[in-house]
């Protein structure tokens, strides 16, 4: 993979996580996101990331692959960390210079927020790498099926999510091709200061948007040719079957949740 965006891609591997019901994986990710917001200390984050590493091993995904997937949000993580360092007050004053103070609470809050974002991106990356877009769409539609009684277009929402997930890596691959084409013409995209780099990326947006609209039109024509109708009840060739291993896997998060709550209310 030439580009660094990993999330949204499917990695076909014969692993325990790959064979789990996609509904179980979606529910696990949802519960994990809720759980990680209860982390409040280094020890609680240690437990959460130990769980991520355990799931990563079950999915047979290498750690460097997940770390590579974090590179697109690297600058956002740095920005979040710096904002908390300079704006969040409390605790001991570490640095004081011309009215600017850096205090311990700011550093801790910045680190904790960054770790939460890293954990969420890593667990979501594992889910997309181990679940095909079709399975994700089916799982999303099945889980939201009760909302149909409120006249919500559940199937259409599921299809939008599936197409969006599929288009993310496709557009990133297209961006790679455009960048290589621009470099072959002598364009300096990766050099210069930040302002220069931003200006150099502007010419990339027009061909990228044109390519995106072309692919969207081709997809719409292909779906229409195959007789796709969003208003007709859809059947699935591959039926989802909830098994005992899915229940066991979903309950893996319970002991971690108990540990985090015990640590939180015991002041550790």
Swiss-Prot record:
Per UniProt, the keywords (alphabetical) are:
Cell membrane, Membrane, Transmembrane, Transmembrane helix, Transport
Mind telling me which Pfam families this protein's record contains?
CbiQ (PF02361)
A Gene Ontology cellular-component term: plasma membrane
Membrane-spanning ranges: 28-48, 63-83, 107-127, 152-172, 248-268
Could you give a GO molecular-function term held by this entry? Answer: transmembrane transporter activity
Keyword Nucleotide-binding assigned: no
Q: Subcellular localization, per the record?
A: Cell membrane
Q: How does it sit in the membrane?
A: Multi-pass membrane protein
Per the record, the domain of life is Bacteria
Q: Does the keyword section mention Cytoplasm?
A: no
Describe its function. Transmembrane (T) component of an energy-coupling factor (ECF) ABC-transporter complex. Unlike classic ABC transporters this ECF transporter provides the energy necessary to transport a number of different substrates.
Subunit structure of this chain's protein = Forms a stable energy-coupling factor (ECF) transporter complex composed of 2 membrane-embedded substrate-binding proteins (S component), 2 ATP-binding proteins (A component) and 2 transmembrane proteins (T component). May be able to interact with more than 1 S component at a time.
Q: Which family does it belong to?
A: Belongs to the energy-coupling factor EcfT family.
> What is the name listed in the Swiss-Prot or TrEMBL entry for this protein?
Energy-coupling factor transporter transmembrane protein EcfT
Q: Specify the species.
A: Staphylococcus aureus (strain 04-02981)
Q: What is the lineage of its organism?
A: Bacteria, Bacillati, Bacillota, Bacilli, Bacillales
Q: Which gene encodes it?
A: ecfT
